[in-house]
Amino acid sequence: MKQVNGEKLLASLGDGVKDIRGRITPDAPMDRVTWFRAGGLAELMFQPHDVDDLIAFLKILPEEVPLTVIGVGSNILVRDGGIPGVVLRLSAKGFGFVELAGENRILAGAICPDKHVAAMAMDNGIGGFHFYYGIPGAIGGAARMNAGANGVETRERLVEVNAVDRKGNKHVLSNAEMGYSYRHSAASADLIFTSVLFEGYPEDRAQIRAEMDAVRNHRETVQPVREKTGGSTFKNPPGHSAWKLIDEAGCRGLVIGGAQMSSLHCNFMINMGQATGYDLEYLGEQVRREVFEKDGIKLEWEIKRLGVFMPGREVRPFQGVTSE
């Protein structure tokens, strides 16, 4: 796919951008905003000031221009050819809030870190959110993918999601309308989540603190929390743990280029220093191949791969045919 110059794309939006209050950056380096610290350029990055600013921008953005929404960059792998069109990165100022919204209820902006919701709940004696303390990333992504840990999932706490569609129309989706399943929601990919309403239950703050401490201590013991990583690489197949399948296939510590499957937790892929998007994705596909050849199970990516490949540096997805 041919990538248009960012300045040219910006100019094509016309005078309407003069009323936009957020930050617009042509040719924005994605390796500065993703936790993997790898990948090419975003043709145009937009960080809206608030919901109204987001709507104003969407109304001037032509439908044919691709739009990619990212959160804090914790669960994405950007390919080296970059991301054509507009990358929407919600700003912490307009979308990073967290506040009480009634008895045992919390309202959080889509870019609010998961752990901030856990902390707000603990401070106010609201139970049921300790699991967020161990999940990297932001609330919008957690709501989108039904993030979970320690036996609890987002769908168990979520009341509704506020969103905006590609045309700038507002929507409110109930828990039922989200259509949740394991690490998945049925919400339209066209919807941009702006905030999420949660509900917990009364619980002693000391008990919540103990639960959060247990989550933190476990995570720091078994996960490479200080490495350049995007979190869990693959979903757990039904009845199996992805890390165990990876380990049994001999892929713990496997290295390709500057990328490695962590020796500490082998379902975490890490950038050892200078890994490219190609290195990381090739490593992931090689792991999928090795696991399939060992156990006949096709691992499904949990990390989202975004953008286009550099010419001559394409990664073929493993299709589950060992003769490939």
Swiss-Prot record:
GO biological process, one term: regulation of cell shape
One Gene Ontology term, aspect cellular component: cytosol
Entry's family note: Belongs to the MurB family.
Domain FAD-binding PCMH-type: 36-203
Entry cofactors: FAD
Active site: 183, 232 (proton donor), 302
Catalytic activity reported: UDP-N-acetyl-alpha-D-muramate + NADP(+) = UDP-N-acetyl-3-O-(1-carboxyvinyl)-alpha-D-glucosamine + NADPH + H(+)
Molecular function GO terms recorded: FAD binding; UDP-N-acetylmuramate dehydrogenase activity
Role this protein plays: Cell wall formation.
HAMAP family per record: MurB (MF_00037)
Family matches, as InterPro entries: FAD-bd_PCMH, FAD-bd_PCMH-like_sf, FAD-bd_PCMH_sub1, FAD-bd_PCMH_sub2, MurB, MurB_C, MurB_C_sf, Oxid_FAD_bind_N
Enzyme class: oxidoreductase
Broad class of where this protein is predominantly found: cytoplasm
Keyword Nucleotidyltransferase: no
Entry annotated with the keyword NADP: yes
Record-given protein name: UDP-N-acetylenolpyruvoylglucosamine reductase
Pathway(s) of this molecule: Cell wall biogenesis; peptidoglycan biosynthesis
Keyword line: Cell cycle, Cell division, Cell shape, Cell wall biogenesis/degradation, Cytoplasm, FAD, Flavoprotein, NADP, Oxidoreductase, Peptidoglycan synthesis
One matching Pfam family: MurB_C
EC number: 1.3.1.98
Subcellular location: Cytoplasm
